[in-house]
């Protein structure tokens, strides 16, 4: 997937032509299908890549741009359709074993990973049978960032001999997955160690069963397709907060136990012990200057914690978040004595349950030069979760698409989809005026044409609308990621937009070289675009903290302060650019051939409200004033302008050698809470806060956010007709790279694969 031009994956989240930034895997704008059925997790909208039967993949199709007419709201940005193999005349069994290890820089042991894929397909009289299994164990290249999973599944199809063109059957899949996520690092000096503020894992059991029925009447040119699904996921959050005691943490910070009486005295007599030191700086603070005040606080911190680093403060903050309630001036001593005891690790949370029921019907009729497709779909989701609470949703849609071929060269396609969505008691998530009356449905339209200019030469144009409802998780999520929170936003609205494309495709052949070149210009526009906002929040009201008054209110009311993220509508956005790709084969001789794919994508991701937003933020002189992103540029967060990808495979007799190459330009903007790239006369309050939480992230990001090049290499051979061996080295040059702050890509990785077909 990562080698497809125009398709990128960040934190499990796919993005087509810059349509998505960083959302930590929730609420995809790109729909992933396996044999026509979505693998998006109901409720969260995240893509469960582990449910895809990779051991049985036949081909992968990518449709770029809005595809919501046929496929629903999650296809706002594009569609990736994975099609599995069908049984042939002879039974086929495939076994693939792989093992690998991560190279430096991690020093504590040698992290390993390995997996086993099994698949078997055959025909038994009128039955088609396919079964598959996968197991995978990955220690991870980062500390405590592992993945362990087992998946089994299959397909059984019965071709009814009594009715020509009738088949029915069932797809079944089960996945057990035990894994931890990696949100942010501990410090720039320890990038492969989890931050104690954000250390969370899950244990999941996912199961679905998909019954289906297909009937094709070739004489009448009609096809009926019925598909259904029952889905269940049981998910248990495992919180891995630090098990260090307060004694361990403060000892690392250079704290002297004899200073405890001094701390108690300061806490009980702060009016005389602390106020005279800090009060003189109040006039400076009122004028927006905090360097003097922060200097005194730094002296106080160095007095008690002379060897403390930002990572130590992370440990301390995480420890405090897990040790509540905090002391008052009357019980400081007793609280400190109790605090010296080791912290007990949190037990697994209660299991969250998500259920989904899906029905889909599609009818198509072929005419002499055209085809009509109509259908409808219904999905009900019920979530009973500590993460989101109890919520239910209904999604009902009907669609129509008409395709017509004119003069043997021109193909025209038009379609419309009507969609209704409800969450809990919000019965009008969308409203549309039809003949003056408001109805709770959203129509989306799509049209396209493809014209054959000449032999192997085509021009195409398309326009498609998109509409994506926020998932239950995006709207109602409330959870603790080991200290970092995720906060709900009940006011989150659906995002909508449209995509237009003009493209040209030309086949070519020069001697033994043949292939095609494709170039497309695209334009995408969004309204109420949903983005991920990282910062400080009120733990009770979930308000975003963007001023001192809100900060003081969070403390004075007892609500408390949380570090975390929230999904929010950012307004209008547009993304336009050019997508250029070519692929082909050069035949040197009967035994030697070179296959290649090369692609370049230029995207310009624009925040259309940037001028008004910058003016509003510039006018806010509050000491805790927040900005929407790390700079004043016009660009959306977590996007790159340029992307180049190349795949080359040389085959000679039973040997093969190949490489994947990828280059991306720098990330244009990130969250302000992480990095501020603006030039200032002196640091502000947020600069000091970032330094305490994240260390010298500002300089690290400035030095490393300059684009990166990654190269993979593979060498293989066919040992026999049925057995092949392949060795791979990913990140051959061992580049350290990041697409976002506080997340470093995998170092050089060595892999050995052995496969057998019989």
Roles of regions detected by a PLM:
Residues 51-96:
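A beta-strand signature from Gram-negative outer-membrane beta-barrel systems
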Residues 225-229, 233-239, 452, 458-462, ...:
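Membrane-embedded beta-barrel scaffold of Gram-negative outer-membrane proteins
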Residues 96, 407-408, 514, 521-525, ...:
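Gram-negative outer-membrane beta-barrel transporters
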Residues 138-149, 159, 163-220, 224, ...:
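Flexible loop and strand-edge segments within Gram-negative outer membrane beta-barrel domains
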Residues 67, 84-120, 133, 138-142:
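Short strand-turn segments of transmembrane beta-barrel domains in outer membranes
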């Amino acid at each position: 997937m990562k080698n497809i031009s125009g398709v990128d994956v960040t934190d499990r989240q796919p993005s087509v032509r810059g349509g998505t930034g960083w959302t930590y895997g929730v609420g995809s704008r790109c729909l992933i299908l396996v044999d026509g059925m979505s693998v998006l997790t109901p409720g969260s909208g995240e893509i469960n890549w582990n449910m895809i039967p990779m051991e049985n993949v036949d081909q992968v199709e990518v449709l770029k741009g809005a595809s919501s007419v046929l496929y629903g709201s999650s296809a706002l940005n594009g569609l990736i359709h994975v099609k599995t193999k069908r049984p042939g005349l002879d039974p086929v069994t495939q076994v693939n074993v792989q093992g690998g290890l991560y190279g430096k820089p991690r020093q504590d042991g040698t992290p390993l990973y390995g997996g086993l894929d099994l698949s078997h397909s055959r025909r038994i009289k009128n039955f088609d049978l396919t079964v598959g299994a996968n197991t995978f164990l990955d220690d991870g290249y980062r500390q405590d960032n592992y993945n362990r999973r087992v998946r089994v599944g299959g397909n059984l199809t019965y071709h009814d001999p009594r009715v020509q063109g009738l088949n029915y059957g069932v797809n079944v899949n089960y996945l057990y997955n035990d894994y931890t996520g990696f949100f942010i690092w501990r410090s720039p000096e320890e990038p492969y160690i989890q931050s104690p503020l954000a250390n969370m894992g899950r244990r999941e059991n996912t199961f679905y069963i998909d019954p289906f029925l297909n009937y094709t009447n070739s004489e009448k040119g009609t096809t009926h397709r019925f598909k259904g699904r029952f889905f269940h996921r049981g998910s248990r959050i495992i919180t891995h907060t630090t098990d260090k005691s307060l004694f361990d943490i403060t000892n690392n910070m250079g704290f002297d136990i004899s200073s405890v009486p001094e701390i108690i005295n300061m806490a009980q007599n702060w009016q005389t012990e602390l106020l005279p030191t800090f009060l003189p700086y109040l006039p400076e603070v009122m004028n927006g200057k905090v360097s003097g005040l922060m200097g005194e606080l730094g002296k106080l911190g160095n007095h008690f914690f002379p060897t403390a680093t930002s990572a130590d403060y992370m440990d301390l903050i995480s420890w405090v978040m897990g040790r509540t309630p905090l002391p008052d001036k009357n019980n400081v001593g007793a609280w400190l004595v109790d605090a010296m005891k080791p912290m007990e690790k949190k037990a697994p949370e209660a299991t969250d349950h998500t259920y989904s029921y899906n029905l889909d019907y599609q009818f198509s009729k072929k005419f002499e030069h055209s085809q009509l497709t109509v259908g409808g779909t219904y999905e009900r989701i019920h979530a009973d979760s500590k993460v989101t609470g109890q919520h239910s949703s209904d999604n009902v849609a009907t669609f129509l698409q008409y395709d017509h071929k004119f003069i043997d060269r021109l193909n025209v396609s038009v379609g419309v989809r009507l969609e209704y969505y409800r969450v809990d008691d919000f019965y009008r998530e969308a409203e549309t005026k039809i003949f003056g009356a408001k109805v709770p449905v959203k129509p989306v339209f799509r049209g396209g044409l493809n014209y054959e200019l000449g032999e192997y030469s085509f021009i195409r144009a398309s326009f498609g609308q998109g509409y994506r409802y926020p998932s239950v998780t995006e709207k109602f999520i409330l959870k603790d990621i080991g200290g970092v929170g995720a906060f709900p936003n009940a006011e989150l609205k659906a995002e909508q937009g449209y995509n237009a494309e003009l493209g040209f495709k030309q086949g070519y052949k020069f001697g033994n070289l043949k292939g095609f070149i494709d170039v497309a210009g695209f334009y995408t526009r969004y309204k109420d675009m949903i983005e991920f906002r990282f910062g400080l929040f009120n733990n009770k009201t979930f308000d975003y903290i963007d001023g001192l008054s809100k900060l003081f209110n969070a403390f004075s009311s007892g609500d408390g302060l949380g570090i975390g993220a929230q999904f929010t509508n950012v307004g209008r956005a547009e993304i336009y650019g050019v997508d250029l790709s070519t692929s082909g084969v050069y035949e040197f001789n009967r035994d030697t051939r070179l296959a290649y794919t090369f692609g370049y994508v230029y995207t310009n991701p624009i925040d259309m409200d940037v001028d008004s937003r910058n003016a509003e933020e510039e006018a806010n002189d509050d000491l805790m004033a927040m900005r929407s992103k790390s700079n004043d540029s016009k660009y959306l967060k977590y996007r790159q302008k340029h992307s180049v990808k190349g795949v080359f495979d040389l085959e000679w007799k039973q040997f093969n050698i190949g490489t994947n190459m990828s280059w991306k330009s720098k990330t244009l903007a990130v969250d302000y809470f992480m990095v501020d790239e603006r030039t200032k006369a002196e640091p502000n309050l947020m600069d000091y806060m970032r330094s305490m939480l994240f260390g010298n992230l500002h300089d690290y990001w400035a030095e490393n956010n300059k684009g990166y090049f990654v190269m993979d290499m593979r060498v293989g051979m066919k040992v026999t007709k049925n057995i092949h061996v392949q060795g791979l080295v990913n990140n051959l040059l061992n580049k350290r790279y990041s697409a976002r702050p506080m997340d470093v890509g995998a170092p050089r990785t060595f892999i050995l694969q052995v496969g057998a077909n019989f």
